[in-house]
Amino acid sequence: MSETPYTATYYVLPAWNEEIALGKVLSDLRTVDPLGHIIVVDDASCDETIKAGESGGACVLPMVAQLGPWGAMQAGMRYAAEKGCWRVITMDADGQHLPSQIARLTDAMNQTDANVVIGACSERGSFLRKFAWNIMKLFSGISAEDLTSGFRLYDRRAIALLVGEEASYLEHQDMGVLARLLGNGMKVVEVDVEMHPRVSGTSRIFNSWPKVLWYMLQTLLLSVSKRRVERVNLEKYKAASAHD
């Protein structure tokens, strides 16, 4: 049976200087879903990320100016929404998120009727990242295990909330996005997944104390201003796949 626009899953991968890792990520993704709609959003890279994406068979959206992690993600989600997507899976292009774990996200959504599933790996991350997580959890009241994971599955209702103008003012795919989702009654669950260290490069945020402190200041201000919205516990869902 042919796939209609409203049964199609799109994969959105923001990429900034990821020419080294991107080819392997796309190859592994094609192995899992040979007919998948893959969108690589090149966030004004200085290397051959665009070429790597095109060589891997992805639809590459080149940004003329750097939008940042969430801006690039939202651009890809808007493109998918315009194409009539059913679901969107967001992944990093640096090799951390494994296509082999996608089934755990889809199983969790199918079994819980969640609007959003977060692929969580609480064991990952540097001291800086874990320090930031603990502070954000303390002030926001959100008990997610992995607040900053970009490995997520969104349904059409969640996508509609995140492609709007109000969501454009967010900086990162974590607290602000969760606040918007939870504040609009979306059901968000987590599922444990395996992750690998990034293949190359460093995090745009969690690579120095000044960047982490600036990120935390932005996030904490958002947490305080949205506190009544964010004081919701995410459901921790352990996927019990028959394939495990």
Predicted feature locations:
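A conserved acidic beta->alpha catalytic loop
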Residues: 42-50, 95
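Short hydrophobic beta-strand elements that form part
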Residues: 10-14, 62
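Short beta-strand-to-loop acidic/aromatic patch adjacent to the donor-nucleotide binding site
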Residues: 85-96
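Conserved catalytic loops of nucleotide-sugar-dependent glycosyltransferases that act on lipid-linked
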Residues: 72-73, 77, 124-237
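Short, well-formed alpha-helical segments that are part of the catalytic scaffolds
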Residues: 17-31
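Conserved donor nucleotide-binding strand/loop of the catalytic core
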Residues: 50-82
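Conserved donor NDP-sugar-binding/catalytic core segment of glycosyltransferases
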Residues: 103-126
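Cell-envelope/extracellular polymer assembly enzymes that use nucleotide-activated donors
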Residues: 8-10, 176
